[in-house]
Amino acid sequence: MGARASVLSAGELDKWEKIRLRPGGKKQYRLKHIVWASRELERFAVDPGLLETSEGCRQILGQLQPSLQTGSEELRSLYNTVATLYCVHQKIEVKDTKEALEKIEEEQNKSKKKAQQAAADTGNSSQVSQNYPIVQNLQGQMVHQAISPRTLNAWVKVVEEKAFSPEVIPMFSALSEGATPQDLNTMLNTVGGHQAAMQMLKETINEEAAEWDRLHPVHAGPIAPGQMREPRGSDIAGTTSTLQEQIGWMTNNPPIPVGEIYKRWIILGLNKIVRMYSPTSILDIRQGPKEPFRDYVDRFYKTLRAEQASQEVKNWMTETLLVQNANPDCKTILKALGPAATLEEMMTACQGVGGPGHKARVLAEAMSQVTNSATIMMQRGNFRNQRKTVKCFNCGKEGHIAKNCRAPRKKGCWKCGKEGHQMKDCTERQANFLREDLAFPQGKARKFSSEQTRANSPIRRERQVWRRDNNSLSEAGADRQGTVSFSFPQITLWQRPLVTIKIGGQLKEALLDTGADDTVLEEMNLPGRWKPKMIGGIGGFIKVRQYDQIPIEICGHKAIGTVLVGPTPVNIIGRNLLTQIGCTLNFPISPIETVPVKLKPGMDGPKVKQWPLTEEKIKALVEICTEMEKEGKISKIGPENPYNTPVFAIKKKDSTKWRKLVDFRELNKRTQDFWEVQLGIPHPAGLKKKKSVTVLDVGDAYFSVPLHEDFRKYTAFTIPSINNETPGTRYQYNVLPQGWKGSPAIFQSSMTTILEPFRKQNPDLVIYQYMDDLYVGSDLEIGQHRTKIEELRQHLLRWGFTTPDKKHQKEPPFLWMGYELHPDKWTVQPIVLPEKDSWTVNDIQKLVGKLNWASQIYAGIKVRQLCKLLRGTKALTEVIPLTEEAELELAENREILKEPVHGVYYDPSKDLIAEIQKQGQGQWTYQIYQEPFKNLKTGKYARTRGAHTNDVKQLTEAVQKIATESIVIWGKTPKFKLPIQKETWETWWTEYWQATWIPEWEFVNTPPLVKLWYQLEKEPIIGAETFYVDGAANRETKLGKAGYVTNKGRQKVVSLTDTTNQKTELQAIYLALQDSGLEVNIVTDSQYALGIIQAQPDRSESELVSQIIEQLIKKEKVYLAWVPAHKGIGGNEQVDKLVSAGIRKVLFLDGIDKAQEEHEKYHSNWRAMASDFNLPPVVAKEIVASCDKCQLKGEAMHGQVDCSPGIWQLDCTHLEGKVILVAVHVASGYIEAEVIPAETGQETAYFLLKLAGRWPVTTIHTDNGSNFTSATVKAACWWAGIKQEFGIPYNPQSQGVVESMNKELKKIIGQVRDQAEHLKTAVQMAVFIHNFKRKGGIGGYSAGERIVDIIATDIQTKELQKQITKIQNFRVYYRDSRDPLWKGPAKLLWKGEGAVVIQDNSDIKVVPRRKAKIIRDYGKQMAGDDCVAGRQDED
């Protein structure tokens, strides 16, 4: 700054500071303008040192002048500043900038005349080029000065800053003044990184060079001696000419200005680039309805500079288009200004115009003094004179408008002072600039209700408060319920804190400013002596008079201090006086936000009567409630509240003290559901080892969080009086009640919000929060750690959460969440198993709970036998004798718990390892560790999914449980050590379709090993006897039969009672296994039985399946096959007749074997077979299911995916960081997919509606993603009549079709990705390939053909179905060829032209049309030949 100050001497600086920026304006030049100018010059690659002399200033003006026409506002300001500075150096008296410019113009005109005169005098004697950088050296030769790095640097900066916006062109023009083509190429090379732009430029240059060559053909013959060749286009572009040649051409007589020509070409190219980078035509620049005029002008000129047009055209555009494209409000004003208005005048006139609402007001304000008629007013001269008196909406002073006001912005409406709307929307007529009626009465304390406080407050609110005394402000906190009542004036900061002050006998309005050191008032006379002073503020420096010891009264408080008087935009009371009157800034923390709670829809609050209580309980409750009422936790209520919940009292465990309990069961049933914020409890094995640890407990946790106001009435309860002496006392809760279902979730979320700022400020602290237990760990020294803990306690206290010392644990071992934490290990708090002679259900439940808790660290704990005792519904107090196994299990557990066991803490740098052992009877135990014998945690697994299972399956489930648990605790999966050989696993995995993925694992030889007890053969066993088995049962009587027929003619049938179809099928298999040799082939038609046995269970809850397993283990080889219905398969048809006798009536359909043949050939889908061969869908489906080509993974355990024609599965998948929404038509595999901008409900719903508009969608099946569960998607489904189903969370199989299509789609995208620039293109290409270019699957179709086929078939089937149902309403009476009697009535199955197909009892017959009478079934029986029915022909 010192260096810049040297530009002017002291005397010159005084002159400088007297010159006004504009004629009649208040602002004058300041030192800062010189500083700004010197910085700006550096950007233009001009030496700021030139500012120090008048000669330097003249050079700068000469450099800037050519760019003025096309330059920006900044360039113009720079020119004006340098011109004024030149006048100061030259000691030319000027009052303002305009005068300075006029003086410069005069001087330039004079010097021009002189130069012309001199040129005339000397003729063309001087050949010196005026073009810098070509200069004449002392020997008179023309030499080239290379373009300076400074110029190049300025050029690079311009391009980097402005990219290719219109400003680039004037800057290029200015920087390349007089340059040779070589210099210009240097400039272009420095910005060569912008390849696309440079390519466009190159093309323009090539076109121009070709055009030059066309217009300047080469002269024939040799060049005369001493003459230069003429430049070609490529010479001008500097590619085929040397620097010497370029200088020669430029300085020749007559010259060929190759530099200027080349520059012109480059500017043409730049214009094209600019148009591409900011492709707006000047005609498109229109002022928006609410756009400030100044912004519009900036846009207009920016685009104007990019236009390729002559200066005359540009001037015309400015004159006409600028006004023409302004918005209606500005246009009215501009037209009133008349045609010759300057831009400056236009901008002044249009200030503050912001949309239609302002029009009348701005005009009225700007012309408030005009009393002439409207027509006179609109004349330009009148308007000009009136324009000066504008008044500011913000501070109410005249001479400037709100946009330029330096006073802080007033909150609320500028017209009426009220909040909630802006001035343009104000309905009041009269603007009230001085705002006597401020939005709150002065000097009075203003009370907030808690809602009001919350309605307009961020978390912290700033208030200015005076104390009556000058004590510290420790007590000045708001009470927690939110009502604030101070005994001193309180000013909120929703408005500017303006107050009335009394000084020197005058009343003034002043702003309380805690950021100002001094008190500054606008011009006024004060008694006493004063000192001159300069003070700095946001708007620069101002000169003031300093008066000391001035008495001043602020809102009734007297103070004496220093007051500064000067040109301040607003009166300011600074800290020097505010501290005297005890004014402080307070930040009362806003009360905890209440979470809105509702009852379930259509329900009312609980109305449960209070049951009688003993005297001592009533006394205890009265005492507790009085105390709670004092603390504001509950409030008394009147009889208007109709709700009630019973209350009672119990003694606390450890004392004689009573505890109040409210039975909120009824209210809980009626309260809305909450999302549990924490899904599980934190586990110590997941804690990292910390140097310092503290455990805190929040006292009265729930009672520190307010309950939603509208919900409080439902928590009403009554304390009865003894002997009903008086009506009971009624209360309701103001805080979260214990025992109410919403308390945990609301407390957790409030606590998280409160701890968040503390967590952010202290990232080095680890804070685990579960309900009211806090674990805080850090690697700080204990002293620093404890300081942090105190900060945390203070932070919680500010929100009203106490952390009682009694439960504040500073030294290990720490008791936390039922665990004991030591510095380098952890365990569960000591567990004592009770010794009892008799055990009740409740005792056993508690015992199992304790053992489950201990199993986290004590390996080998079992509870299966104890749990078996609890099966069935029993009363809690029922005594249960322990079985021998349970006694044994309990004794083993006692042994395990005798030795205390410890776990260690997690080390993120080491791998996790999980080891599993089999304990027998379906129980497993596991340990997770990082170093051998140092367990992080242990556990057990004994869950049986499904009735029949085997060890491999259970092991897989255990692995998945442990993997999930590890992800929750440590965020990663461990490596597994499993007691199963790789071969066994591989066998199982390849054979069993439902085997799921398990993480990385290795075999560990810990007996007992897991093995498969038997294996089923893949091919029929040659030479072994084949048993066709079947069973049938009657649903009503529950009687059944099971049996078999063998290929050797053996057969057996047994009768069963109280059975089902499924049981009889299994019974038949059991019979076959019992009666067969060591090798056997078994053929069944039961999918159910096949499904159970193929999964190779080794134990089952079903006695029958267990017996089958025993038999299977005894066999050497077993082949089990499934066939669909029994027609045409000899053994099966026979056995079916055997077992069906008297059990079921099956109509065998001829079509089955034909359908099977057809399916083997073409693999047609079940729908096609059902319609072609008239099969029931279940049979057709089973044919497909038994085909190994169509069914890669066997039948699904829980039935197949639903393949109805209207079902689609939707899912989002991610690729390259983008979201692809995929919809798959389940039955055909046809895909619709799209890249969507975001995974939101809005986008999903839009996609869904598009899908429904293209295809018949009846059901969509999605996962539980938030976009699919959103209200928008539900609404779209409702509107389009689509049923929405959700998958099973965390079970990818429930979304199997779309998941596999995602993989397929990604695979195809991978194949075509390099053919497309954008992912969205690649996605559509992949969809096309998948739908139409990949054939295969059912029917050998492509997915596109298949969906059309399925939908068409579906329509036809429905039509056919309608006809069939119609046909079935008819009965047929027919004659046999040899028998003259009419037979019937038979059922009509099909009616053709010449014959009908009928079903009489179980026979299907074809009868010629002429021998059949078809009638409607009116329920009448045939009486004889001439019966009425016989004559009702149906043709």
Swiss-Prot record:
What positions does the domain Reverse transcriptase occupy? 631-821
Q: Give the residue ranges for region: Interaction with Gp41.
A: 7-31
Query: Which residues are tagged with the site Cleavage?
Result: 132-133, 363-364, 377-378, 432-433, 440-441, 488-489, 587-588, 1027-1028, 1147-1148
Record lipid sites (N-myristoyl glycine): 2
Catalysed reactions listed for this entry: Specific for a P1 residue that is hydrophobic, and P1' variable, but often Pro; Endohydrolysis of RNA in RNA/DNA hybrids. Three different cleavage modes: 1. sequence-specific internal cleavage of RNA. Human immunodeficiency virus type 1 and Moloney murine leukemia virus enzymes prefer to cleave the RNA strand one nucleotide away from the RNA-DNA junction. 2. RNA 5'-end directed cleavage 13-19 nucleotides from the RNA end. 3. DNA 3'-end directed cleavage 15-20 nucleotides away from the primer terminus; 3'-end directed exonucleolytic cleavage of viral RNA-DNA hybrid; DNA(n) + a 2'-deoxyribonucleoside 5'-triphosphate = DNA(n+1) + diphosphate
Q: Specify the Peptidase A2 domain's residue ranges.
A: 508-577
What is its cofactor?
Mg(2+)
Region Interaction with host AP3D1: start-end pairs: 12-19
Specify where the region named RT 'primer grip' lies, as residue ranges: 814-822
Region of interest: Dimerization/Multimerization of capsid protein p24? 277-363
Q: GO cellular component annotations, sorted alphabetically? A: host cell; host cell nucleus; host cell plasma membrane; host multivesicular body; membrane; viral nucleocapsid; virion membrane
Which positions does UniProt annotate for Zn(2+) binding? 1159, 1163, 1187, 1190
DNA-binding region of this protein: 1370-1417
Integrase catalytic domain residues: 1201-1351
Query: Which amino acids does the record list as binding Mg(2+) 2?
Result: 1030, 1065, 1085, 1136
Query: Where is motif Nuclear localization signal found?
Result: 26-32
| GO BP annotations, alphabetical order | DNA integration; DNA recombination; establishment of integrated proviral latency; proteolysis; symbiont entry into host cell; symbiont-mediated activation of host apoptosis; symbiont-mediated suppression of host gene expression; viral genome integration into host DNA
**Which EC number(s) does UniProt give?**
3.4.23.16, 2.7.7.49, 2.7.7.7, 3.1.26.13
Record-annotated disulphide pairs? none
Query: Where, by residue number, is the active site?
Result: 513
Q: Where is this region: Interaction with host CALM1?
A: 8-43
The remark listed among the other comments is: HIV-1 lineages are divided in three main groups, M (for Major), O (for Outlier), and N (for New, or Non-M, Non-O). The vast majority of strains found worldwide belong to the group M. Group O seems to be endemic to and largely confined to Cameroon and neighboring countries in West Central Africa, where these viruses represent a small minority of HIV-1 strains. The group N is represented by a limited number of isolates from Cameroonian persons. The group M is further subdivided in 9 clades or subtypes (A to D, F to H, J and K).
Name of the molecule in the record: Gag-Pol polyprotein
Gene, per the UniProt record: gag-pol
